[in-house]
């Protein structure tokens, strides 16, 4: 990987992209330092990959660090750190703090120039669709959509709440009005349901 990065930078690339098997700042920094021995101003793009189990990786990193420091970790089973029973533990809170600071730590300590997540909307769309389906077809019924989606769009000022505008119905109305004048049957207008959103 390091040789490929150096070769790419020597042949016109302005940034490098590396992949690691886990999100570990020390490992990433070690790779970047080796590249910078040859290309001192190398810029790294790092994929904060959804392929990583971030929770498990950081819980294991904290477990290992605490163990190396001589801290008592006997209440934790390293092979089972994803267990919900650990979610409110000191180890889990420390791991979450490390996840929260990963971008800043990676930039400072590993020389990451740009962080990205590949396919984040694939995961957010799947999760939100699954949650909506459970609510809508479950006990909440239509309230599952209203409280879980529409009301949040309104409160957060998300333009998609006016989906008719977002899908271009106003553009279609402009064309209809151009060709039919006042007789145009438009999707918008004072009776349009979208006007309920202000």
Q: Which stretches of residues belong to each language-model region?
A:
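Short acidic/histidine-rich active-site segments
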Residues: 117-121
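Polybasic, proline/glycine-rich intrinsically disordered low-complexity segments
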Residues: 138-151
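TerminUS-proximal long segments
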Residues: 157-170
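A SIS-like phosphosugar-recognition module
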Residues: 55, 123-124
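Acidic, glycine-enriched catalytic cores built around paired aspartates
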Residues: 154
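Alpha/beta enzyme core
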Residues: 1-116, 129-130, 134, 140, ...
């Amino acid at each position: 990987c390091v040789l490929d990065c150096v070769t790419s930078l020597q042949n016109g690339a302005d940034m490098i992209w590396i992949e690691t098997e886990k999100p570990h700042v020390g490992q990433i920094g070690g790779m970047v330092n080796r590249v910078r021995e040859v290309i001192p101003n190398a810029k790294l793009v790092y994929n904060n990959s959804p392929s990583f189990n971030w929770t498990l990786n950081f819980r294991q990193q904290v477990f290992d660090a605490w163990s190396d420091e001589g801290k008592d970790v006997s209440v934790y089973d390293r092979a089972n750190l994803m267990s919900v029973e650990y979610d409110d533990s000191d180890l889990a809170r420390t791991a979450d703090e490390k996840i929260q600071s990963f971008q800043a730590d990676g930039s400072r300590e590993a020389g990451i120039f740009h962080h990205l997540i590949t396919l984040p909307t694939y995961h957010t769309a799947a999760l939100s669709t699954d949650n909506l389906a459970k609510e809508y077809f479950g006990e909440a019924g239509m309230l599952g959509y209203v409280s879980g989606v529409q009301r949040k769009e309104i409160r957060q000022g998300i333009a998609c709440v006016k989906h008719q505008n977002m899908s271009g119905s106003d553009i279609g109305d402009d064309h209809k009005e151009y060709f039919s004048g006042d007789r145009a049957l438009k999707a918008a207008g004072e009776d349009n349901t979208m006007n309920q959103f202000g």
